[in-house]
A protein has these predicted regions:
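Flexible, acidic glycine-rich loops studded with aromatic residues
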Residues: 151-168, 174-299
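Phosphate/diphosphate-binding loops
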Residues: 23, 37, 80, 84
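Single conserved hydrophobic/aromatic residue that forms the stacking wall/gate
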Residues: 1-9
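Aromatic/hydrophobic pocket-lining residues that form π-stacking "cages" and hydrophobic walls in ligand
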Residues: 22, 33, 141
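Active-site neighborhood of glycoside hydrolase catalytic domains
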Residues: 46-52, 56, 61-168, 174-188
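Glycine-rich, aromatic-flanked loop segments that form ligand/cofactor-binding clefts
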Residues: 27-51, 58, 189-192
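Glycine-rich, histidine-containing beta strand-loop boundary motifs that form or position
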Residues: 35-39, 104, 156, 195
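Anion (oxyanion) recognition and catalysis
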Residues: 20-23, 27, 146, 185-186
Length: 299
């Protein structure tokens, strides 16, 4: 997608060959790379390059910072799905893993509610709720992924629409949209837990402390899913738009990454014992040149 690449700041994009090299680097270390292309929200750069994919086709400047924006992909236009199919066909071929994250979070419906294309689509489908219009959008994208042998992963926001397919994996990040999560799990849906109140590592240690991470429990609406067969595990997130250097990145990760790694495999044990072991790990990491948060900043 040359137009979008030309608009990138400081050449911050990957060539296909670079993607392949990252995947191979991870494979040799026992890791899989799962791509995410968030949609219909968080598509500001996509719409800046291709304005016709939004509801009103207005020119949009490429954003220089993160945020939530009202201009999102238009589900009322057939060309939106034609573009997505071309995009996913190209990207799916690069990634061998059978999972593909399509986001679905933080998608304001402001423009959809004024858009004649969206209104026409809703009338044709017999929909009255704009969350269900997003549900329609999600189903269309999931169908494209299935043609490429991929299983969709979505943020838990998408559960605000009706009858989300339990073949999709839900990633729980926010209590704001947690009410539908238990019913999805009870229907057999699989969930990854990434609660922002503990497992978002772009938050400073003063907010999501090492102690808080170590004692995190996968609780939704007062119920623990620690022993549920539908709880796939934990994923810590680190959104990097405000991370300027590799050293800052490492400081945010360590030693919190040790904590989430331990509790993902075992129940939390004695925290003082964990802290002692974390200190030893930090000493080793520091000798390897890793910039870890010092102990006085852990909690």
């Amino acid at each position: 997608y040359r137009r979008q690449r030309q608009m990138c700041i400081r050449d911050r994009y990957y060539t296909q060959e670079e993607i392949r090299s990252v995947i191979e680097y991870a494979r040799l270390r026992g890791m899989e790379i799962i791509p995410e292309i968030d949609m219909p929200g968080h598509t500001r750069s996509m719409i800046a390059a291709y304005p016709h994919l939004s509801c009103f086709g207005e020119k949009t400047e490429l954003c220089q910072f993160g945020g939530i924006f009202e201009k999102i992909l238009c589900p009322g236009k057939d060309e939106t799905f034609e573009f997505i199919e071309k995009l996913l066909t190209e990207v799916c071929a690069l990634f061998p893993d059978n999972r593909f994250h399509i986001g679905g979070d933080e998608a304001p419906k402001t423009e959809w509610k004024k858009c004649p294309h969206c209104k026409a689509r809703m009338e044709a489908l017999g929909l009255t709720d704009y969350e269900d219009l997003q549900g329609y959008f999600t189903k269309r994208v999931v169908a494209i992924l299935k043609k490429h042998g991929k299983r969709a992963v979505c943020w838990n926001d998408v559960l605000e629409s009706k009858d989300v397919d339990t073949g999709n994996i839900i990633q729980y990040w926010t209590a704001q949209h947690e009410a539908p999560v238990p019913a999805f799990i009870e229907r057999g849906g699989k969930v990854i837990f990434s609660n922002m109140s503990a497992l978002y590592f772009d938050y400073p240690h003063g907010i999501n402390s090492l102690n808080k991470v170590y004692h995190y429990q996968p609780v939704v609406m007062g119920k623990s899913y620690a022993d549920s067969p539908n709880m796939l595990g934990y994923e810590a997130a680190l959104w990097s738009e405000q991370v300027e250097t590799p050293e800052h990145l490492e400081e945010l990760l360590f030693p919190r990454l040790y904590a989430v790694s331990e509790i993902a495999w075992n129940e939390a044990g004695d925290y003082a014992d964990f802290e002692h072991r974390a200190e030893k790990k930090i000493e080793i990491a520091a000798k390897q040149g890793v910039n870890c948060m010092t102990k006085d900043g852990w909690n």
